[in-house]
Amino acid sequence: MTGCIVGWAHTKFGKHEGVELETLIVDAATGAMVDAGVAPVDVDEIYIGHFNGGFVMQDFPASLVLQAHNDLRFKPATRVENACATGTAAIYQGLKAIAANQARIVLCVGVEKMTELNGAAIGEVLTKASYYREEGGENGSFVDIFARIAESYFQKYGDQSDALAQIAAKNHANGAVNPLAHFQKDLGYAFCREPSDKNPLISGPLKRSDCSPVTDGAAAVVLADTTTAMGMDKAVLFRATAHVNDFLPMTKRDVTQFEGAAKAWHQAYDRAKIGVDDLDVVEVHDCFTIAEMLIYEAMGLAEKGQGASVIADGVSTKDGKLPVNPSGGLKSKGHPIGATGVSMHVMAAMQTRGDAGALQINGAEIAGVFNMGGSAVANYASILEAVR
């Protein structure tokens, strides 16, 4: 697939009381078109990423994007869903439309409104992104799923609590200077390391500081074919994309390694003709701190069982060899399911153009994005580079 991101917009992530789903959609869509300098009449197709699953009563949201401008009326609009990778799935559908010469300019929006439900109801919705008959309902919640992953990893490779606390502290420190982040507070390593009344154990070895928050928000990008993009004010090229799905049941996989994630990363490297050492910055799917550590191994920063060394050696810190999640990641920025993948691409695109403000990594030219659905079931890896 070829194509470029030529504009973007991003609402603040957090709890948006009294703000309707359609307001988040319209704000992000409008902002992205304005940022790209694209008139609504010139948009050829629309894709919206929205997991929902019961967070809000409004399903079938695709045509809500049309409310951003009357000139979007009668444009083809389609909802895309692939669990927590829903946002990237929407972007990839847009890229496919461009690659197939069915569209020249595509608007992609990701959105989720999660906070209207109580905690138990939210947990029940989220477990629908697992193999429900074995992993959901009475069998546990989504945090229980990643707690089992952590426990299995600890049993095989030893206690990794220090590394998980370092990852949490890193991402909160990064998010503290991100004005769009849900949490903008540097918690520090000591707080993240030890259980306390304010940071209790939630499941297995995972504490509250190991878990991404329940969040509302939206993000949007405008995509264009490469020829069109080169005539616009900014263009961030997809040098490569890769999408790999693994088995849904955890019982059919070795949960101490993200094999689907590794395949997606290495397909992306091969297609971009680069290696992990060529990346300058990455945004990865740290829904739980154990996920970020396993992604270190999947992307080739460490051998199996050695992911802790990446954070211990400072490789993934903001001033390290390969900064990971300078935005604060899902852990601090927030994880509104359908918006997450789009948000990650916005954050990475900003880095490649030097537009990331306080989040900017000096000299960042090539960015990686890894967004996953479920427990490394749907795996999406993108390699981005600014060409304008």
Give short role names for the model-derived ranges:
Residues 6, 32, 43-46, 87, ...:
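Buried hydrophobic positions in well-ordered alpha/beta secondary-structure cores of metabolic enzymes
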Residues 1-22, 165-167, 201-263, 267, ...:
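Condensing-enzyme catalytic core mediating Claisen C-C bond formation in acyl metabolism
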Residues 258-262, 266-289, 293, 298, ...:
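Extended C-terminal subregions enriched in glycine
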Residues 41-50, 76-82, 106-111, 162-169, ...:
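Beta-strand segments within the central parallel beta-sheet cores of soluble alpha/beta enzyme folds
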Residues 1-85, 149, 153-160, 182-192, ...:
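Conserved active-site "lid/cap" helical segment
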Residues 81-112, 144-178, 221-227, 333-356:
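Active-site-proximal alpha-helical scaffold in enzymes
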Residues 53-61, 250-254, 286-308, 320, ...:
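Short glycine/threonine-rich loop-to-helix capping motif typified by GTGT followed
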Residues 4, 16, 52-109, 113-145, ...:
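Conserved catalytic cysteine-centered active-site region
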